[in-house]
Amino acid sequence: MLTGQECLEVSDSRITASTVEMLDCDKEYDIAVIDEAQMVADDDRGHSWTRAILGTLAGEIHICMSPVAKDVVIHLINLCHDEYEIREYERKTALKLEDKPFSFPQDVREGDAFIVFSKKSVLNIAGRLEENGIKPSVIYGSLPPEIRRRQMTLFNEKKTQVVVSTDAIGMGLNLPVRRIVFLEVEKFDGVSRRPLVISEIKQIAGRAGRFGLYDTGYVTALGQKNLNYLKNTLNIPEQDIDIVSLGFPQVLLTMDAPLDAIIKLWHEAEPSAPFRKINVDEILFLYGYAYKERYFIADFDDKYLLYKMITCPIDIKDRELVRQWLRYCMSYTSDISLDKPDKHSKYQGLMKYESYYKKLDLYYQFSVRMGKIVEEDWLENERDKTQAKIMQLLSKSKDEYIIRCRYCGRILPIGNSRNICRDCYSMIRR
């Protein structure tokens, strides 16, 4: 299995499974399977599905998707002048929206998966469940992949009774979930807080009712207002996807112009339907960050090399990580291996170790991109130790993560956005 974070090798294996970003389009396969192809419209990752559909070299390609993506995927296939065959399948377990809204914690049942949309909310709900004697597994985006697998294993083996997750549960996770419970029906999408759209609801709700374990999967929401939103949204016919995300074509790097100018020029040109170009803000942010130190970066004028650097996937909101990335840009020619990440961090507790794990990921990804030798024994040992510490912290009481009124310490209702209870708010307003 190959992802941007790890490479898990099995001797004599004839099958390679990878994230879509890690697909080698220069390698020829006997058969290829591209899953979740409705993601071609995704603003962040969609261009990788577009690249896979247009660029996979295989005698036979199976493209699995939601029906709403069928026409746009056929359009991509026709651009390649390839033949295709359509096969449609029905969901094997029924999916039922419950009539009664969910009450927390009275209605908690074994096999439930609770959906919220931030790490803070995941740990808050997990802490509340523990206070009620219920053991949860937790899943959220910044958890290392091995920790996610271990949390899933705890649930699969019934060592935990429920799961608390972000929408990370919607893709690539196969869990014995009986019921999906939406505790929130709004999410922050990086720009603003907005209601979930029908495709997001269906993607998550579809995790309820594992085939072979349950005949029916159930879906509900916290409170009548949220349940009504689910009912109303699910009754709206889902619109066909009419957008395909398009990534930056590296062939343009041959142009005689600075890299940032080329990227901006490409992005300003209007694409033909159904294509929509990716957002290049993060790439240009990293370019600008590197440009300030360009005299200390070897071969800064090599656009192919620089493009590799600025497209290295990192969380630009984590400034410790960005500083580490810049150090690698400035020092990658000084030795056969990159410097090991700094363990010191401004963060404490769980966030400290999650941040360090991201630094280890950056060490690995930047090394692979720039052809540096990865000190694999050291890296594996550091990852193991960091994962063990994260698991240890997750196994402890999560009382500190429960969101309480900042004045009286009372536990706040789920979804409260003020960090203050109603009584204290009324007193302050007098």
Set out the residue ranges of the language-model regions:
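Conserved helicase motor
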Residues: 2-10, 18-22, 119-120, 138-150, ...
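Conserved strand-helix element at the start of the C-terminal RecA-like helicase core
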Residues: 62-64, 70, 107-132, 136-140, ...
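Non-catalytic terminal extensions of ATP-dependent helicases
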Residues: 249-430
